[in-house]
Amino acid sequence: MTVPFGILLGFFIPQIKQHLQLSLRAWLATPVIFGAMALTLLIALGNAQFVPSTAADYVLEGEADDPKWTHYGASAGGDSYSSAEQINRDNVADLETAWTFHTEEDAATAMTFQSTPIEIGGDLFFCSPSNRVFSLNGDTGSQNWLHDPQVNRDKVPFFVCRGLAYHQTPESNDFCASRLLMGTVDDRLIALDSKTGARCSDFGINGEVDLSEGLGDVLTGHHFVSSPPAVIGDIAVVGSFIMDNQSTNQPPGVVRAYNVHTGALAWAWDVLQDVAHAPLKEGEAYPPNTANVWGVMSVDEELGLVYLPTGNVPPDFFGGLRTEEQDRYPSSVVALEAATGNVSWSFQTVHHDIWDYDAGSQPVLVDFPLDDGSTAPALILPTKRGDIFILDRRTGEPLTEVVEKPVPQNPVEGEWLSPTQPFSVGFPSFAPEDLSESKMWGSTMFDQLWCRIEFKKRRYEGLFTPQSFQGTIQDPGNFGAVDWGSASVDPERQLLLINSTGMPFLQIMYSREEIDQMGARLWGTEAKDEVAKGAAKGKGALWPLLGTPYGISSNAFLSPLGFPCHQPPWGRLTAVDLKTREKIWERPLGTTDGHAPLGLAFPTGVFNIGGTAVTRGGLTFVAGTIDNYLRAFNSETGAELWRGALPAGGQAGPMSFVSPTTGSQYVVIPAGGHVSMGTVLGDAVVAFKLKTD
């Protein structure tokens, strides 16, 4: 996973002023400039207009299941679907804020608030960026309890916790029979009683397991947990986040499974092998510098499989020193036998990935409709590069056509490339159209000209253009077309709903001597300052790639005014019919509200991070955009039916549940902003419900 710095400076007037070093006289003349910008944006909206679909209504048969949201993605299969239908297309316009809860988290130190709450018995459970765990009454938002693990802040480069895992011991009301599990940013796995928030004393030592064991010597902040464990049976499977683009000697990316009752290690697996590791002897460590699993995993209890979206082999942007064994499983989905940790099957979405197109999305498990009218147990994997792969989750075989196509070659000296890459041609892609000089965009004719000149200077040959000293335009950037927000599936209407974004990056390779002189260092206390300084000077993030001949800078491809060099829309929301495998509608997602000059809110579609939630009521809920709204769309037509203002950026996945006490349906989302997106930071969890008379 990459943390892009300064991506969204483009809509901030003060930053534009600072970048251009405008004098007072020039600044007073900016209404003329912004008038030209506004005119250009209005013209650009011709490319971003949306007409709702006229698709026929989808007929729902049978009664709704009991609405539950007990996992990060609603179900263990990550479909982010609620069978609740009290809130529907006819009344969603009557949604209002039911309650707002503040965690009192220090927004200055929080990286991003991404924790989608889970619901158990009418109570909500979530973690703050610094791993403080909260239990709230779902009807009132009042706090039941708080557990603060007091993470070691000196060990944390940034704070993120995407959510909690839940395990219930059948037919038991004992202490910790209902328990929550969380990995922390200082490498611990903690088990809590869901009723009281107290540590489960039977788990590990004082309710926690030390995840740093077996990792060897790890630099501070280079290894931690950002996503919830995957629980299957009586084991919890835990991945890890590893700092990107640092060196060829990063911590192990080992995936480990622990007994949910005792905390005992059940098995450990990494990408160098097909079978789980034998138990380590005292003083031994897992192999370093292996691909990790930083995203959310999915499980199939019936098949006994856990599905891992894998990351890259460090460093992400240079792979010339990787071994064949290291390259076998990265940027893939790997199915492991939950009982043993052995590989059942794998499917690779990018061969020898040097673009940071790792698999960050949670695999979505569905019953996929086949051409003969039957269904197959399937796995849907959205990817950063924009393709979506549909696989038989029993075997890993594609259920829609995948072909290998030639891709650009001629990398830097010492690198090598796969001659082909897999393309999912049997399902709609969310990869951007190829860039060209004529497609360069600007808020004025001047920055459009600058973008055209810059485009001609750089190397760009479409998707999979390799890194270069000339400077490579990578589109989509490693921010992704689709990142960890993944997709939602309405199983009754057989619709896939997905939000995507577009941001090309300019990445420039430098020699070892040059990158050292520019100040690139391993991430740590000094490195954080160096990255910030580099971004402020327009270099973007500086990555050292130690152990290789090179270093690299990575920056969003923006004009001198800070606007994107490519034409809008810059963010989309799309529905795909799984039966016909066609897009039934696609629309711009988000506006420039709060970021454009003169208070203008252009519906250009904007950059977004987060996921969607779909309901039986025919609605798709999504936030994620830079304009700080939660929106509701008609899942069948794409029409926007409602929007609710959030107190901060909603860069997270929403969820919905029905209270067992009052019968009211709620839609809930964290609103804490995202440092890298420049959205308003905060500490809120906001719940919406229908107005009452």
Language-model segments: residues:
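Cytosolic-side transmembrane helix boundary signature
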Residues: 2-34
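Internal/C-terminal transmembrane anchor helices
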Residues: 21-49, 487
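Ser/Thr/Pro/Gly-rich low-complexity linker/stalk segments immediately outside membranes or between
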Residues: 45-64
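Mature N-terminal segment immediately following signal peptide/propeptide cleavage
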Residues: 60-104, 574
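Repeat-blade elements of multi-bladed beta-propeller folds
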Residues: 69-73, 110-130, 157-188, 221-247, ...
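Short, solvent-exposed loop/turn elements at domain surfaces
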Residues: 76-83, 105-110, 134, 316-317, ...
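Extracytoplasmic/lumenal domain signature
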Residues: 91-104, 133-154, 168-173, 189-220, ...
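Segments forming glycine/polar-rich beta-alpha architectures that bind adenosine-containing cofactors
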Residues: 470-504, 509-511
